Amino acid sequence: MLDAQTIATVKATIPLLVETGPKLTAHFYDRMFTHNPELKEIFNMSNQRNGDQREALFNAIAAYASNIENLPALLPAVEKIAQKHTSFQIKPEQYNIVGEHLLATLDEMFSPGQEVLDAWGKAYGVLANVFINREAEIYNENASKAGGWEGTRDFRIVAKTPRSALITSFELEPVDGGAVAEYRPGQYLGVWLKPEGFPHQEIRQYSLTRKPDGKGYRIAVKREEGGQVSNWLHNHANVGDVVKLVAPAGDFFMAVADDTPVTLISAGVGQTPMLAMLDTLAKAGHTAQVNWFHAAENGDVHAFADEVKELGQSLPRFTAHTWYRQPSEADRAKGQFDSEGLMDLSKLEGAFSDPTMQFYLCGPVGFMQFTAKQLVDLGVKQENIHYECFGPHKVL
Protein backbone atom coordinates (compact mmCIF):
# COMPACT_ATOMS: atom_id res chain seq x y z
CA MET A 1 0.00 0.00 0.00
CA LEU A 2 1.12 3.53 -0.73
CA ASP A 3 1.22 6.11 2.03
CA ALA A 4 -0.76 9.34 1.83
CA GLN A 5 2.30 11.49 1.12
CA THR A 6 3.37 9.33 -1.81
CA ILE A 7 -0.14 9.42 -3.27
CA ALA A 8 -0.34 13.20 -2.90
CA THR A 9 3.08 13.68 -4.50
CA VAL A 10 2.22 11.53 -7.52
CA LYS A 11 -1.17 13.20 -8.01
CA ALA A 12 0.50 16.60 -7.89
CA THR A 13 2.42 15.70 -11.06
CA ILE A 14 -0.73 15.05 -13.10
CA PRO A 15 -0.97 18.60 -14.58
CA LEU A 16 2.65 18.33 -15.73
CA LEU A 17 2.01 14.94 -17.32
CA VAL A 18 -1.08 16.19 -19.12
CA GLU A 19 0.73 19.27 -20.40
CA THR A 20 3.61 17.17 -21.73
CA GLY A 21 1.46 14.48 -23.32
CA PRO A 22 3.00 11.67 -25.39
CA LYS A 23 6.29 13.59 -25.62
CA LEU A 24 6.96 11.99 -22.23
CA THR A 25 6.62 8.45 -23.52
CA ALA A 26 8.45 9.27 -26.76
CA HIS A 27 11.46 10.30 -24.64
CA PHE A 28 11.03 7.17 -22.51
CA TYR A 29 11.02 4.77 -25.45
CA ASP A 30 13.90 6.52 -27.20
CA ARG A 31 15.92 6.28 -24.01
CA MET A 32 15.05 2.67 -23.30
CA PHE A 33 15.80 1.43 -26.82
CA THR A 34 19.12 3.30 -26.79
CA HIS A 35 20.24 1.74 -23.51
CA ASN A 36 18.51 -1.64 -23.91
CA PRO A 37 18.34 -2.34 -27.66
CA GLU A 38 17.58 -6.01 -26.95
CA LEU A 39 14.02 -4.91 -26.15
CA LYS A 40 13.50 -4.15 -29.84
CA GLU A 41 13.17 -7.93 -30.16
CA ILE A 42 10.01 -7.76 -28.04
CA PHE A 43 8.26 -4.49 -28.82
CA ASN A 44 6.25 -3.96 -31.99
CA MET A 45 8.47 -1.42 -33.71
CA SER A 46 5.74 -0.54 -36.23
CA ASN A 47 3.62 0.76 -33.35
CA GLN A 48 6.65 2.74 -32.19
CA ARG A 49 7.04 4.39 -35.59
CA ASN A 50 3.39 5.39 -35.94
CA GLY A 51 3.15 6.65 -32.36
CA ASP A 52 0.32 4.34 -31.28
CA GLN A 53 2.31 2.64 -28.52
CA ARG A 54 3.62 5.95 -27.18
CA GLU A 55 0.08 7.30 -26.93
CA ALA A 56 -1.16 4.11 -25.28
CA LEU A 57 1.59 4.15 -22.65
CA PHE A 58 1.01 7.83 -21.90
CA ASN A 59 -2.70 7.19 -21.41
CA ALA A 60 -1.88 4.30 -19.07
CA ILE A 61 0.52 6.41 -16.99
CA ALA A 62 -1.97 9.27 -16.73
CA ALA A 63 -4.77 6.85 -15.79
CA TYR A 64 -2.63 5.30 -13.06
CA ALA A 65 -1.71 8.68 -11.58
CA SER A 66 -5.36 9.74 -11.63
CA ASN A 67 -6.60 6.51 -10.01
CA ILE A 68 -3.72 5.84 -7.66
CA GLU A 69 -6.13 5.95 -4.71
CA ASN A 70 -8.57 3.60 -6.44
CA LEU A 71 -6.58 0.77 -7.99
CA PRO A 72 -9.64 -1.49 -8.45
CA ALA A 73 -10.81 0.99 -11.11
CA LEU A 74 -7.71 0.05 -13.12
CA LEU A 75 -8.18 -3.72 -12.96
CA PRO A 76 -9.93 -4.05 -16.36
CA ALA A 77 -7.04 -2.18 -18.00
CA VAL A 78 -4.51 -4.24 -16.04
CA GLU A 79 -6.14 -7.46 -17.25
CA LYS A 80 -6.07 -6.31 -20.88
CA ILE A 81 -2.39 -5.34 -20.69
CA ALA A 82 -1.35 -8.41 -18.69
CA GLN A 83 -2.97 -10.72 -21.22
CA LYS A 84 -1.14 -8.95 -24.05
CA HIS A 85 2.14 -9.07 -22.10
CA THR A 86 1.97 -12.86 -21.91
CA SER A 87 1.99 -13.06 -25.71
CA PHE A 88 5.28 -11.12 -25.55
CA GLN A 89 6.51 -13.35 -22.69
CA ILE A 90 7.28 -10.33 -20.50
CA LYS A 91 9.38 -11.30 -17.45
CA PRO A 92 9.65 -9.67 -13.98
CA GLU A 93 13.19 -8.43 -14.58
CA GLN A 94 11.99 -6.40 -17.56
CA TYR A 95 9.78 -4.36 -15.24
CA ASN A 96 12.96 -3.23 -13.48
CA ILE A 97 14.34 -1.97 -16.79
CA VAL A 98 11.12 -0.09 -17.56
CA GLY A 99 11.06 1.43 -14.07
CA GLU A 100 14.64 2.61 -14.39
CA HIS A 101 13.96 4.40 -17.67
CA LEU A 102 10.64 5.83 -16.51
CA LEU A 103 12.26 7.52 -13.51
CA ALA A 104 15.20 8.68 -15.62
CA THR A 105 12.76 10.16 -18.14
CA LEU A 106 10.90 12.07 -15.43
CA ASP A 107 14.22 13.38 -14.10
CA GLU A 108 15.61 14.38 -17.50
CA MET A 109 12.43 16.08 -18.70
CA PHE A 110 11.24 17.80 -15.52
CA SER A 111 14.01 17.72 -12.86
CA PRO A 112 11.24 17.33 -10.25
CA GLY A 113 13.51 16.59 -7.30
CA GLN A 114 14.24 13.44 -5.34
CA GLU A 115 10.98 13.46 -3.38
CA VAL A 116 8.92 13.21 -6.57
CA LEU A 117 11.22 10.57 -8.07
CA ASP A 118 11.02 8.50 -4.89
CA ALA A 119 7.21 8.76 -4.89
CA TRP A 120 6.98 7.66 -8.50
CA GLY A 121 9.44 4.85 -7.79
CA LYS A 122 7.18 3.53 -5.03
CA ALA A 123 4.06 3.96 -7.15
CA TYR A 124 5.62 2.19 -10.11
CA GLY A 125 6.76 -0.65 -7.87
CA VAL A 126 3.22 -1.26 -6.65
CA LEU A 127 1.82 -1.30 -10.19
CA ALA A 128 4.64 -3.50 -11.49
CA ASN A 129 3.92 -6.07 -8.80
CA VAL A 130 0.24 -6.13 -9.78
CA PHE A 131 1.25 -6.95 -13.36
CA ILE A 132 3.94 -9.44 -12.38
CA ASN A 133 1.56 -11.38 -10.14
CA ARG A 134 -1.27 -11.46 -12.66
CA GLU A 135 1.02 -12.45 -15.51
CA ALA A 136 2.48 -15.26 -13.39
CA GLU A 137 -1.06 -16.56 -12.91
CA ILE A 138 -1.74 -16.48 -16.65
CA TYR A 139 1.55 -18.22 -17.46
CA ASN A 140 0.72 -20.93 -14.92
CA GLU A 141 -2.81 -21.34 -16.29
CA ASN A 142 -1.52 -21.67 -19.85
CA ALA A 143 1.16 -24.20 -18.89
CA SER A 144 -1.05 -26.37 -16.69
CA LYS A 145 -4.14 -26.72 -18.91
CA ALA A 146 -4.53 -29.70 -21.23
CA GLY A 147 -2.51 -29.07 -24.38
CA GLY A 148 -0.92 -25.98 -22.84
CA TRP A 149 2.73 -24.98 -22.83
CA GLU A 150 5.28 -22.53 -21.48
CA GLY A 151 7.11 -20.01 -23.62
CA THR A 152 6.99 -20.56 -27.37
CA ARG A 153 6.10 -23.77 -29.21
CA ASP A 154 6.84 -24.72 -32.80
CA PHE A 155 3.83 -25.00 -35.12
CA ARG A 156 3.78 -25.97 -38.78
CA ILE A 157 1.61 -24.22 -41.36
CA VAL A 158 -0.62 -27.00 -42.73
CA ALA A 159 -2.92 -24.85 -44.87
CA LYS A 160 -2.77 -21.37 -46.39
CA THR A 161 -6.00 -20.17 -47.99
CA PRO A 162 -6.74 -16.79 -49.62
CA ARG A 163 -10.10 -15.57 -48.31
CA SER A 164 -10.29 -12.23 -50.13
CA ALA A 165 -8.01 -9.84 -51.98
CA LEU A 166 -6.52 -8.79 -48.64
CA ILE A 167 -7.12 -11.61 -46.13
CA THR A 168 -5.48 -15.04 -46.01
CA SER A 169 -6.08 -17.73 -43.40
CA PHE A 170 -3.39 -19.99 -41.94
CA GLU A 171 -3.99 -23.32 -40.24
CA LEU A 172 -1.31 -24.36 -37.78
CA GLU A 173 -0.58 -27.65 -36.03
CA PRO A 174 2.12 -28.40 -33.43
CA VAL A 175 5.36 -29.93 -34.72
CA ASP A 176 5.48 -32.21 -31.67
CA GLY A 177 2.14 -33.76 -32.62
CA GLY A 178 0.63 -33.12 -29.20
CA ALA A 179 -2.71 -31.64 -28.26
CA VAL A 180 -3.20 -27.88 -28.16
CA ALA A 181 -4.82 -25.76 -25.48
CA GLU A 182 -8.40 -24.65 -25.78
CA TYR A 183 -9.28 -20.96 -25.71
CA ARG A 184 -12.24 -18.67 -25.40
CA PRO A 185 -13.82 -17.44 -28.64
CA GLY A 186 -12.42 -13.97 -29.28
CA GLN A 187 -8.91 -14.60 -27.94
CA TYR A 188 -5.69 -14.40 -29.98
CA LEU A 189 -2.40 -16.19 -30.56
CA GLY A 190 1.04 -14.66 -30.14
CA VAL A 191 3.03 -15.28 -33.34
CA TRP A 192 6.84 -14.89 -33.17
CA LEU A 193 8.76 -14.43 -36.43
CA LYS A 194 12.29 -13.52 -37.46
CA PRO A 195 12.69 -14.41 -41.13
CA GLU A 196 15.89 -13.72 -43.01
CA GLY A 197 16.22 -9.99 -43.62
CA PHE A 198 14.20 -8.89 -40.59
CA PRO A 199 16.33 -6.57 -38.41
CA HIS A 200 14.49 -7.69 -35.27
CA GLN A 201 12.25 -10.46 -34.12
CA GLU A 202 8.64 -9.46 -34.67
CA ILE A 203 5.74 -10.49 -32.42
CA ARG A 204 2.15 -10.10 -33.49
CA GLN A 205 -1.23 -11.13 -32.12
CA TYR A 206 -3.79 -12.67 -34.47
CA SER A 207 -7.33 -13.60 -33.51
CA LEU A 208 -8.31 -17.25 -33.58
CA THR A 209 -11.07 -17.72 -36.12
CA ARG A 210 -12.92 -20.87 -35.16
CA LYS A 211 -14.07 -22.95 -32.21
CA PRO A 212 -11.25 -24.88 -30.48
CA ASP A 213 -10.76 -28.42 -31.78
CA GLY A 214 -7.80 -29.55 -29.65
CA LYS A 215 -5.65 -30.31 -32.72
CA GLY A 216 -4.56 -26.97 -34.12
CA TYR A 217 -5.35 -23.32 -34.66
CA ARG A 218 -6.57 -21.10 -37.47
CA ILE A 219 -5.81 -17.41 -37.82
CA ALA A 220 -6.51 -14.93 -40.62
CA VAL A 221 -4.14 -12.12 -41.58
CA LYS A 222 -4.92 -8.94 -43.48
CA ARG A 223 -2.23 -7.64 -45.79
CA GLU A 224 -1.49 -4.19 -44.37
CA GLU A 225 0.09 -1.55 -46.58
CA GLY A 226 3.68 -1.28 -45.37
CA GLY A 227 3.10 -4.05 -42.83
CA GLN A 228 6.34 -5.99 -42.50
CA VAL A 229 4.88 -9.11 -40.89
CA SER A 230 1.55 -9.30 -42.73
CA ASN A 231 3.23 -8.91 -46.12
CA TRP A 232 5.82 -11.56 -45.27
CA LEU A 233 3.08 -14.00 -44.26
CA HIS A 234 1.15 -13.32 -47.47
CA ASN A 235 4.15 -13.35 -49.81
CA HIS A 236 6.62 -15.80 -48.30
CA ALA A 237 5.08 -18.08 -45.66
CA ASN A 238 4.28 -21.48 -47.16
CA VAL A 239 2.68 -24.74 -46.14
CA GLY A 240 5.33 -26.70 -44.25
CA ASP A 241 7.01 -23.64 -42.74
CA VAL A 242 7.42 -23.55 -38.96
CA VAL A 243 6.53 -20.57 -36.77
CA LYS A 244 6.68 -20.08 -33.03
CA LEU A 245 3.46 -19.53 -31.11
CA VAL A 246 2.63 -18.45 -27.58
CA ALA A 247 -0.47 -19.92 -25.95
CA PRO A 248 -3.82 -18.18 -26.60
CA ALA A 249 -4.60 -15.12 -24.49
CA GLY A 250 -6.78 -12.02 -24.42
CA ASP A 251 -9.47 -10.40 -22.29
CA PHE A 252 -11.95 -10.02 -25.18
CA PHE A 253 -14.03 -13.15 -25.43
CA MET A 254 -17.62 -14.33 -25.53
CA ALA A 255 -19.08 -16.14 -22.53
CA VAL A 256 -22.88 -16.31 -22.72
CA ALA A 257 -25.63 -18.67 -21.63
CA ASP A 258 -27.64 -20.54 -24.26
CA ASP A 259 -30.63 -18.26 -23.72
CA THR A 260 -28.64 -15.02 -24.12
CA PRO A 261 -29.09 -13.23 -27.47
CA VAL A 262 -25.89 -12.11 -29.18
CA THR A 263 -25.02 -9.53 -31.84
CA LEU A 264 -21.64 -9.70 -33.59
CA ILE A 265 -20.65 -6.43 -35.29
CA SER A 266 -17.50 -6.12 -37.38
CA ALA A 267 -15.76 -4.33 -40.22
CA GLY A 268 -13.01 -5.68 -42.44
CA VAL A 269 -10.58 -8.03 -40.71
CA GLY A 270 -12.36 -7.22 -37.45
CA GLN A 271 -14.58 -10.17 -38.26
CA THR A 272 -11.82 -12.64 -37.28
CA PRO A 273 -12.62 -12.93 -33.54
CA MET A 274 -16.33 -12.87 -34.44
CA LEU A 275 -15.86 -15.97 -36.60
CA ALA A 276 -14.69 -17.93 -33.55
CA MET A 277 -17.72 -16.66 -31.63
CA LEU A 278 -20.14 -17.55 -34.43
CA ASP A 279 -18.57 -20.99 -34.88
CA THR A 280 -18.85 -21.62 -31.13
CA LEU A 281 -22.51 -20.58 -31.09
CA ALA A 282 -23.29 -22.71 -34.14
CA LYS A 283 -21.53 -25.82 -32.83
CA ALA A 284 -23.35 -25.42 -29.49
CA GLY A 285 -26.73 -25.09 -31.19
CA HIS A 286 -27.33 -21.72 -29.53
CA THR A 287 -31.09 -21.26 -29.20
CA ALA A 288 -31.30 -17.50 -28.65
CA GLN A 289 -31.14 -14.87 -31.39
CA VAL A 290 -27.76 -14.38 -33.09
CA ASN A 291 -27.10 -11.36 -35.33
CA TRP A 292 -24.15 -11.02 -37.70
CA PHE A 293 -23.65 -7.45 -38.92
CA HIS A 294 -20.59 -6.88 -41.10
CA ALA A 295 -19.20 -3.96 -43.11
CA ALA A 296 -16.73 -4.25 -45.99
CA GLU A 297 -15.49 -1.92 -48.69
CA ASN A 298 -16.70 -4.22 -51.49
CA GLY A 299 -16.94 -7.85 -52.50
CA ASP A 300 -13.25 -8.14 -53.40
CA VAL A 301 -12.24 -7.65 -49.77
CA HIS A 302 -15.20 -9.41 -48.14
CA ALA A 303 -13.78 -12.59 -46.59
CA PHE A 304 -15.49 -15.69 -45.17
CA ALA A 305 -18.94 -14.86 -46.61
CA ASP A 306 -19.70 -18.50 -47.46
CA GLU A 307 -18.51 -19.72 -44.06
CA VAL A 308 -20.72 -17.23 -42.23
CA LYS A 309 -23.71 -18.28 -44.34
CA GLU A 310 -23.11 -21.95 -43.60
CA LEU A 311 -22.71 -21.38 -39.86
CA GLY A 312 -25.81 -19.21 -39.78
CA GLN A 313 -27.88 -21.95 -41.39
CA SER A 314 -27.19 -24.20 -38.40
CA LEU A 315 -28.62 -21.66 -35.93
CA PRO A 316 -32.38 -21.63 -35.29
CA ARG A 317 -32.56 -17.83 -34.92
CA PHE A 318 -29.99 -16.09 -37.10
CA THR A 319 -30.00 -12.73 -38.88
CA ALA A 320 -27.19 -11.49 -41.13
CA HIS A 321 -26.80 -8.10 -42.77
CA THR A 322 -23.83 -6.93 -44.82
CA TRP A 323 -22.94 -3.38 -45.83
CA TYR A 324 -20.61 -2.53 -48.74
CA ARG A 325 -19.35 1.04 -48.60
CA GLN A 326 -18.48 1.16 -52.31
CA PRO A 327 -19.87 -1.90 -54.09
CA SER A 328 -18.81 -2.65 -57.64
CA GLU A 329 -21.18 -3.36 -60.49
CA ALA A 330 -20.24 -7.03 -60.13
CA ASP A 331 -21.24 -6.90 -56.46
CA ARG A 332 -24.62 -5.47 -57.42
CA ALA A 333 -25.13 -8.12 -60.07
CA LYS A 334 -24.33 -10.92 -57.62
CA GLY A 335 -26.50 -9.43 -54.88
CA GLN A 336 -23.99 -10.43 -52.23
CA PHE A 337 -24.59 -7.46 -49.93
CA ASP A 338 -27.69 -6.07 -48.24
CA SER A 339 -27.07 -2.32 -47.94
CA GLU A 340 -24.80 0.25 -49.55
CA GLY A 341 -22.87 2.86 -47.58
CA LEU A 342 -21.94 2.97 -43.91
CA MET A 343 -23.43 0.61 -41.35
CA ASP A 344 -26.78 2.01 -40.17
CA LEU A 345 -28.15 -0.01 -37.27
CA SER A 346 -31.29 2.10 -36.84
CA LYS A 347 -32.89 0.24 -39.76
CA LEU A 348 -32.43 -3.03 -37.86
CA GLU A 349 -33.48 -1.83 -34.41
CA GLY A 350 -36.03 -4.60 -34.03
CA ALA A 351 -33.31 -7.24 -34.40
CA PHE A 352 -31.73 -6.35 -31.06
CA SER A 353 -34.50 -4.97 -28.89
CA ASP A 354 -33.94 -7.60 -26.17
CA PRO A 355 -32.35 -5.76 -23.19
CA THR A 356 -30.28 -8.84 -22.27
CA MET A 357 -28.56 -9.00 -25.66
CA GLN A 358 -24.76 -8.88 -25.60
CA PHE A 359 -22.92 -6.95 -28.33
CA TYR A 360 -19.40 -7.71 -29.53
CA LEU A 361 -17.61 -5.18 -31.76
CA CYS A 362 -14.33 -5.35 -33.67
CA GLY A 363 -12.94 -3.26 -36.50
CA PRO A 364 -11.19 0.08 -37.03
CA VAL A 365 -11.50 2.38 -34.01
CA GLY A 366 -13.53 4.95 -35.95
CA PHE A 367 -15.96 2.25 -37.04
CA MET A 368 -16.41 0.99 -33.48
CA GLN A 369 -16.94 4.51 -32.15
CA PHE A 370 -19.52 5.06 -34.88
CA THR A 371 -21.43 1.85 -34.21
CA ALA A 372 -21.16 1.98 -30.41
CA LYS A 373 -22.73 5.46 -30.44
CA GLN A 374 -25.57 4.13 -32.58
CA LEU A 375 -26.16 1.31 -30.11
CA VAL A 376 -26.23 3.65 -27.12
CA ASP A 377 -28.56 6.03 -28.97
CA LEU A 378 -30.84 3.04 -29.60
CA GLY A 379 -30.98 2.31 -25.89
CA VAL A 380 -28.31 -0.38 -25.50
CA LYS A 381 -26.56 -0.29 -22.11
CA GLN A 382 -22.83 0.40 -22.15
CA GLU A 383 -22.16 -2.68 -20.02
CA ASN A 384 -23.64 -4.87 -22.77
CA ILE A 385 -21.14 -3.59 -25.36
CA HIS A 386 -17.77 -5.39 -25.58
CA TYR A 387 -15.04 -4.50 -28.06
CA GLU A 388 -11.52 -5.29 -29.19
CA CYS A 389 -8.92 -2.97 -30.71
CA PHE A 390 -6.26 -4.48 -32.95
CA GLY A 391 -3.03 -2.85 -31.78
CA PRO A 392 -2.69 -0.60 -28.71
CA HIS A 393 -5.98 -0.20 -26.87
CA LYS A 394 -8.11 2.89 -27.33
CA VAL A 395 -11.24 3.92 -25.44
CA LEU A 396 -14.39 4.24 -27.56
Curated annotation (Swiss-Prot):
Q: Which residues bind heme b?
A: H85
**Binding locations of FAD:** Y188, R204, Q205, Y206, S207, C389, F390, G391, P392
CC cofactor: FAD; heme b
Q: Which GO terms describe its biological process?
A: cellular response to nitrosative stress; nitric oxide catabolic process; response to nitrosative stress; response to toxic substance
Which residues are annotated as site, described as Involved in heme-bound ligand stabilization and O-O bond activation? Y29
Report the main location listed first in the record.
cytoplasm
> In Gene Ontology terms, what is one molecular function of this protein?
hydroperoxide reductase activity
Give residues annotated as binding NADP(+): G268, V269, G270, Q271, T272, P273
Entry note about domains: Consists of two distinct domains; an N-terminal heme-containing oxygen-binding domain and a C-terminal reductase domain with binding sites for FAD and NAD(P)H.
Official protein name in the record: Flavohemoprotein
Gene for this chain: hmp
